[in-house]
């Protein structure tokens, strides 16, 4: 075996490899010798088939099988001796001329091939004990609990007919029928019958609900509006429209009395039990938000302290996945790059940066996990599957079967568990300080937020 490195460009490596015909022949002979005691041929006793006869019958297929195995073993040896961790599957270029292939299979010629790969860079991990991470913590206030219960009450409130001669006010529920036109022409989706709308709920396009204030039952009005420029249907986006609208029923919201009886309608023994449940849910929500903020800060820190070239092929794969998703989302929502105030080139550049970050962080997290023997147990994966099944009542068996028979889906379920365990490992070493914040501060938008790995 002869190996010559021909390319060492960044993370790209390429080798020219020669496997001598004599070495291939020796492997073929050993394989045929092993076969002679197992092959059954008419006219020969078991174990008495001449090697020459076997070679005439099986020589070509055995040689091809042997060459394939030798290439695999040789490549493994090349990569192992050099300490390579592969980022991509090896790309092998074999002789293509028919006469060359025939010479190799006949054992008359050496096999010359090239193998090209991208390797994972050597990653020098930072000292995680030097990391300082601020952990925002928000306490659940009584006012938060009251607000949550008020929202529940608002969502469950009843409405009563306002009676003859009444006019619609903000907060009222109005049942309407409408016919929409653009430049006098009806359009798809512009007609509705018996539609209920709560004035002020912002469920209709801007300006529509406000023009219902003062309308009476049986009254017809022409509402003039303009579809938002980022409207989901691109054919309607930014266009002015008129809706001939008739109100058929006017209803006023009834005040909800938040007491034990109200709690019982929701399945709780008392108002105190309802408040207890609401506090527990809010506590879990705040803890989840805290976790996401801490994780984001930590991933940003890992990004800052681990700057290296990511394997281009992995970045391209990640970008392709993201870009297909973005394009599909834009098409389904009727959006364009112009409506999003950008260009396709600028968007691609931004998402390539995100793809590069994701790949680098993925490699860093993998390196940390590998060096510190962090693993995901089968029990942890099973619990995740069970939790996913609980989210789909009535389809638990189908969910379980889906993951049991889909290795890729199971790997996708395992990945975030692994990531969280690595994050927890780093946080154990880092200097984490808690900071009490308000609910608003905990949930505020962070302009510096970056897409996590």
From Swiss-Prot:
Disulfides per UniProt: none
Name listed for the protein in its UniProt record: Trigger factor
Keyword Calcium: no
Enzyme class (EC, first level): isomerase
This enzyme's EC code(s): 5.2.1.8
Keywords: Cell cycle, Cell division, Chaperone, Cytoplasm, Isomerase, Rotamase
Main location: cytoplasm
Pfam families for the chain: FKBP_C, Trigger_C, Trigger_N
GO biological-process terms attached to the record: 'de novo' cotranslational protein folding; cell division; chaperone-mediated protein folding; protein transport; protein unfolding
Molecular function as annotated in GO: peptidyl-prolyl cis-trans isomerase activity; protein folding chaperone; ribosome binding
Family: Belongs to the FKBP-type PPIase family. Tig subfamily.
Domain named PPIase FKBP-type: residues: 171-256
GO cellular component annotations of the record: cytoplasm
The gene coding this protein: tig
Compartment list: Cytoplasm
Matches recorded under HAMAP family: Trigger_factor_Tig (MF_00303)
PANTHER family found in the cross-reference section: TRIGGER FACTOR CHAPERONE AND PEPTIDYL-PROLYL CIS/TRANS ISOMERASE, TRIGGER FACTOR-LIKE PROTEIN TIG, CHLOROPLASTIC
Written domain comment of the UniProt record: Consists of 3 domains; the N-terminus binds the ribosome, the middle domain has PPIase activity, while the C-terminus has intrinsic chaperone activity on its own.
Functional description taken from the UniProt entry: Involved in protein export. Acts as a chaperone by maintaining the newly synthesized protein in an open conformation. Functions as a peptidyl-prolyl cis-trans isomerase.
Residues of the signal peptide: none
């Amino acid at each position: 075996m002869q190996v010559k490195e021909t390319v060492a460009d960044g993370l790209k490596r390429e080798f020219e490899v020669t496997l001598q015909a004599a070495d291939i022949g020796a492997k073929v002979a050993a394989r045929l010798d092993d076969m002679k005691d197992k092959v059954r041929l008419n006219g020969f006793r078991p174990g008495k088939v001449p090697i020459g006869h076997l070679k005439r019958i099986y020589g070509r297929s055995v040689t091809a099988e042997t060459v394939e195995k030798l290439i695999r073993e040789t490549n493994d040896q090349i990569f192992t001796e050099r300490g390579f961790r592969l980022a991509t599957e090896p790309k092998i270029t074999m002789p293509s001329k028919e006469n060359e292939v025939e010479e190799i299979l006949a054992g008359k010629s050496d096999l010359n091939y090239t193998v090209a790969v991208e390797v994972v860079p050597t990653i020098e991990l930072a000292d995680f004990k030097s990391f300082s991470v601020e952990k925002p913590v928000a306490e659940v206030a009584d006012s938060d609990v009251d607000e949550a219960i008020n929202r529940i009450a608002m969502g469950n409130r009843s409405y009563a007919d306002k009676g003859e001669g009444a006019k619609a006010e903000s907060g009222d529920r109005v049942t309407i029928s409408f016919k929409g036109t653009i430049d006098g022409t009806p359009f798809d989706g512009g007609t509705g019958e018996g539609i209920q709308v709560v004035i002020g709920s912002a469920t209709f396009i801007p300006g529509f609900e406000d023009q219902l204030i003062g309308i009476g039952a049986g009254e017809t009005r022409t509402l003039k509006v303009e579809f938002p420029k980022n409207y989901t249907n691109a054919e309607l986006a930014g266009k002015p429209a008129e809706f001939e609208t008739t109100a058929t029923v006017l209803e006023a919201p009834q005040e909800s009395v938040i007491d034990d009886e109200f709690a019982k309608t929701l399945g709780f023994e008392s108002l105190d039990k309802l408040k207890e449940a609401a506090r527990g849910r809010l506590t879990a929500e705040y803890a989840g938000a805290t976790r996401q903020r801490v994780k984001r800060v930590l991933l940003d820190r890992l990004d800052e302290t681990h700057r290296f070239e990511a394997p281009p092929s992995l970045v391209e794969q990640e970008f392709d996945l993201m870009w297909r998703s973005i394009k599909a989302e834009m098409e389904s929502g009727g959006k364009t790059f112009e409506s999003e105030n950008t260009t396709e080139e600028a968007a691609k550049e931004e998402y390539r940066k995100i793809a590069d970050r994701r790949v680098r962080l993925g490699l860093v997290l993998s390196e940390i996990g590998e060096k510190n023997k962090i693993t995901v147990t089968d029990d942890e994966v099973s619990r995740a599957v069970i939790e996913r099944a609980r989210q789909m009542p009535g389809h638990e068996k189908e969910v379980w079967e889906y993951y049991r028979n889909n290795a890729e889906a199971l790997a996708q379920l395992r990945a975030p568990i692994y990531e969280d365990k690595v994050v927890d490992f780093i946080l154990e070493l880092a200097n984490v300080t808690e900071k009490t914040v308000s609910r608003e501060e905990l949930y505020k938008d962070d302009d510096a937020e970056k897409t996590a790995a």
